[in-house]
Amino acid sequence: MNNTEFHELVDEKLQLIEDMIDDSGADIEPVITGNVLTLEFENRSQIVINKQEPMHEIWLASKSGGFHFSYVDEKWTCSKTGMEFIEMVKEECQKHADEEIEWA
């Protein structure tokens, strides 16, 4: 994968996260600054998601720790847990919000 393809794939996922949050009605504020998407919660906690272009990875930092995702078999998979990226984002959002979120 080249850098252009990497950015297109990651941007698609970041937009999906924003859309999912909007559709859920959860009190989460997504803020994009450069290559970083920060999800800010009512309790002032944050999830930080960023593009790591040199490694072609997505990194996610939350109160559960730091996670790296690589694009394998057409999906972003965590090197530590084997979990798919969007599923982990949903799980971490629920932990940070301290409530069940109704994902569309």
From Swiss-Prot:
One of its GO terms (cellular component) is cytosol. InterPro entries: CyaY, Frataxin/CyaY, Frataxin/CyaY_sf, Frataxin_CS. GO terms for molecular function: ferric iron binding; ferrous iron binding. Keywords: Iron, Metal-binding. Transmembrane segments: none annotated. GO terms for biological process: iron-sulfur cluster assembly. The keyword Iron applies. The keyword DNA repair does not apply. It comes from the Bacteria. It holds the Pfam family Frataxin_Cyay. CDD domains: Frataxin. Involved in iron-sulfur (Fe-S) cluster assembly. May act as a regulator of Fe-S biogenesis. Belongs to the frataxin family. This is Iron-sulfur cluster assembly protein CyaY. The gene is cyaY.
